[in-house]
């Protein structure tokens, strides 16, 4: 069995790490490189960086900090933000990233997933899915351009359909960003994760809602996710990564302990 992964998420805007609640009202957390090094030193299995306004601004992720991160950490990291061509991806990978993640650009042009997978291999290609539960309809819908509140829009895709579509096109991993839960720290949406897990044959990463160590355990035990991504509990030092992994191992979760 592959070890489960603990993945701190660093949302980047204007060269700094920020964090919002339900993808809104972002506050500045700190500088990118020192935070990345701290999480690597604490025992994170990998890191994810989202340049949250790149797609809505019509630009690619700022690559200047990617190489600086690569110089100070020795764990895999994934970069996302406005990547919409093979050249964009090649540049980011050449600066030291191990994976690239696409979200809004994949919705705009689903063939991008296949072209990237064919060029760089599926192991490098992550698709991020920003999913919102609409209580009125009882359905999960995919959202686009979520880094900019004024441009966020609901797409035609229901989440389960898009999960299956991106796999057909070559996604090597899926990060499910559950917008309703984002930043509120009351637990991952286990019902949604379980529904996605049932149709997802590639590694699935849960994102949105972690507030306690038990929430991580529930995601691994009850929804069978491969990794758990979190931000605010790490940024605000509510949970220490090393202590979290010790706790999970004691609960029988297969995990790399520092």
Swiss-Prot record:
Keywords: Amino-acid biosynthesis, Cytoplasm, Histidine biosynthesis, Lyase
Class of this enzyme: lyase
Biological source species: Klebsiella oxytoca
Compartment list: Cytoplasm
This protein's record includes keyword Plastid: no
Entry's Gene Ontology molecular function annotations: imidazoleglycerol-phosphate synthase activity; lyase activity
Subunit structure: Heterodimer of HisH and HisF.
InterPro entries: Aldolase_TIM, His_biosynth, HisF, IGPS_HisA/HisF, RibuloseP-bd_barrel
Reaction(s) catalysed by this chain's protein: 5-[(5-phospho-1-deoxy-D-ribulos-1-ylimino)methylamino]-1-(5-phospho-beta-D-ribosyl)imidazole-4-carboxamide + L-glutamine = D-erythro-1-(imidazol-4-yl)glycerol 3-phosphate + 5-amino-1-(5-phospho-beta-D-ribosyl)imidazole-4-carboxamide + L-glutamate + H(+)
Entry annotation: catalytic residues: 11, 130
Keyword Transmembrane helix assigned: no
Superkingdom per UniProt: Bacteria
Reported function: IGPS catalyzes the conversion of PRFAR and glutamine to IGP, AICAR and glutamate. The HisF subunit catalyzes the cyclization activity that produces IGP and AICAR from PRFAR using the ammonia provided by the HisH subunit.
EC number: 4.3.2.10
Pathway given in the UniProt record: Amino-acid biosynthesis; L-histidine biosynthesis; L-histidine from 5-phospho-alpha-D-ribose 1-diphosphate: step 5/9
Membership in a protein family: Belongs to the HisA/HisF family.
Alphabetized NCBIfam families for the sequence: hisF (TIGR00735)
Gene Ontology biological process terms, A to Z: L-histidine biosynthetic process
Protein name: Imidazole glycerol phosphate synthase subunit HisF
GO cellular component: cytoplasm
Major location (coarse): cytoplasm
